[in-house]
């Protein structure tokens, strides 16, 4: 696995072991890091990543980043996975692959008041790649990416694709507003 390559304005920082990219991204954002920081942990059994944004809008408008990142993930996995793999999104950030829960997106922001402008917003991705135990059927409502026929999808390539597809979604939202995102979401 090689170090991921990101589009301009995005820069990656790898963490290893038990380090939580979401927590690190939130700490870096609170310290005033640049928007576009991608903190990631490419473990053998899990893809953990977080992206720092500086939305310059109030919280209730900035929360559009969660569905933008979700659609970005769906498009990224859809481009890399076999065509028969179904990826569905849940409003709370949950990800489903072939009908079973397979990871989640989560969000944190510098403010909790929906009417306050944000200094930063972080969206995190937690995606199980490989089953933790020897009995994957033990929890039939949960799955992992590789258990669903995606063993050829490399974590670094998926991370790169997620950031790229998310950037396309952000640019589209910036240019056209939320209507295209609503259309994309309904199509999923």
Task: Go through each PLM region and give its residues.
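Long, positively charged amphipathic alpha-helical accessory segments at protein N-termini or as interdomain linkers
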Residues: 1-35, 58-64, 68-82, 101-188
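Short, ordered beta-strand-loop transition motifs
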Residues: 40-43, 88-90, 114-115
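A short acidic, often aromatic-flanked loop/helix-cap motif at beta-alpha or helix-coil junctions
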Residues: 48, 95, 153
